[in-house]
């Protein structure tokens, strides 16, 4: 099913954008892993899907559980192996995280998890504070986390934009990093502070990759929606 969808979507994406993939040697050619990218446009999942397609990996995504209840669309999500996520108090949790993680590992799949959980609230599109879904999945399944950053999707579709900019073709750069070292968190019981510390390592890696792509330095303090009276899910501003 995924290959059928890709056959329809990939040509369209190639028409509107040029994809420049960097450090692809960091993406495992086989075996399961979590791909953890930054997130600032609704079109990001398509961009990362095309990137994985180019690398001959068929990605899965963690999707809001409510989407699986939509007629036809929900069936499509299930048919393509997407993983439902329950959202509660601003925290993303797989409906059965251990079972989902084990299935991903058993299948040898690549799963895309946005650690921020939603579009960044940072006004300059830097990664904001992350949630623990990516590291929980990776640690429970004992698989690596591959950080990634992209820049250029905001030219295709601005944050909360309503129309895709079709012309001229946009350049999108995607940079993949080496696996995040989570060895300090493996093989032992973990509490909330451990997951938070592991998540910070992932967010540091993503931010560093984005700094490289942008040729800029990110703010010293990562954006935290709770300190700016912003919601952590859904829209936080009008387009």
Which residues make up each language-model segment?
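A transmembrane-helix-recognition feature enriched in membrane-embedded lipid enzymes
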Residues: 1-29, 71-80
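Hydrophobic/aromatic ligand-binding patch that stacks against planar heteroaromatic rings
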Residues: 51, 76, 103, 134-140
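Short gly/ser/thr-rich secondary-structure transition/capping motifs
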Residues: 14-21, 92-95, 156-158
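A charged, well-structured terminal subsegment
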Residues: 98-103, 170-212
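A cross-family acyltransferase "interaction/gating" segment
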Residues: 123-192, 223-225, 236-237
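Catalytic-site beta-strand/loop segments enriched in glycine and acidic/polar residues
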Residues: 103-134
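Short, highly charged C-terminal tails/helix-capping segments
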Residues: 214-238
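Catalytic core of membrane glycerolipid acyltransferases/transacylases, capturing the structured
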Residues: 28-92
């Amino acid at each position: 099913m995924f290959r059928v969808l890709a056959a329809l979507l990939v040509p369209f994406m190639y028409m509107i954008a040029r994809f420049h993939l960097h450090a692809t040697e960091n993406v495992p050619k086989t075996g399961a892993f979590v791909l953890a990218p930054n997130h600032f446009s609704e079109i990001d999942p398509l961009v990362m899907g095309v990137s994985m397609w180019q690398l001959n990996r068929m990605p899965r995504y963690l999707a809001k559980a409510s989407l699986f209840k939509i007629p036809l669309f929900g069936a499509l999500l299930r048919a393509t192996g997407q993983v439902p996520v329950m959202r509660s108090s601003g925290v993303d949790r797989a409906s059965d995280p251990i079972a989902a993680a084990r299935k991903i590992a058993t299948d040898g799949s690549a799963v895309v998890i946005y650690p921020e959980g939603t579009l960044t609230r940072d006004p300059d599109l830097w990664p904001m504070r992350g949630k623990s879904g990516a590291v929980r999945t990776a640690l429970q399944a004992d698989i690596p986390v591959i950080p990634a950053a992209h820049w250029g999707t905001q030219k295709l579709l601005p944050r909360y934009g309503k129309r895709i900019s079709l012309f001229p073709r946009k350049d999108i750069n995607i940079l993949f990093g080496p696996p995040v070292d989570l060895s300090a968190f493996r093989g032992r019981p973990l509490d909330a502070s451990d997951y938070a510390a592991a998540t910070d390592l992932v967010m540091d890696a993503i931010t560093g990759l984005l700094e490289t792509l942008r040729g800029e330095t990110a703010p010293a303090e990562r954006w935290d929606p709770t300190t700016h009276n912003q919601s952590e899910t859904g829209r936080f501003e009008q387009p």
